[in-house]
Amino acid sequence: MGKRKRIRINIKRMAAFLLITAAVITSIILAICFYFESRPTELREPVSEVGAIPVITDFLPEGTAARPGQERKIKYIVIHETGNAGKNAHAASHNKYLHDIADSQLKSWHYTVDDHEIYYHIPDNEIAFHAGDGLNKDGGNLNGVGIEMCVNPENDYEQTLKNAAKLTAMLLEAYDLDLGSVKTHHD
């Protein structure tokens, strides 16, 4: 075999080796990036109040339909209204409602806010069923902290908005999210 032919073969082998090495390194880097992007968000420290608004923590039982306990990465804060204009449909009554249906329905959210208190139902880093999008990989249920605002007639709606804004600001800061991460049910 001639010297030139051996050089060409060695160059081809070297090129193949470099190409395979680059592919392996790229795969490792992508796997590391995917791991850090997809691993669940670490849960923040619990609070008993947000800006002087009491926060009552009353988690739904883990392993129920409403709280399967699946951890995820937080990407959004999703703001809703309860749609319940019934008398006494305040945060405490919505908390009772969630506990009553927890075993039987895929319906849940993380917080209920009214004009004087906030109920905390599911840890922020677990999925809940509030956005109507199932478990869509980019959807609010899988990626969003759900906040429901009470709209009952005896509720001071303006104060509820302020309370929800304070809670949202606290969550944005706690999870290092920007304002673009705030969504509504319809987004």
Place the predicted regions along the sequence by residue:
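Active-site-adjacent loop/helix surface patches within enzyme catalytic domains
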Residues: 46-176
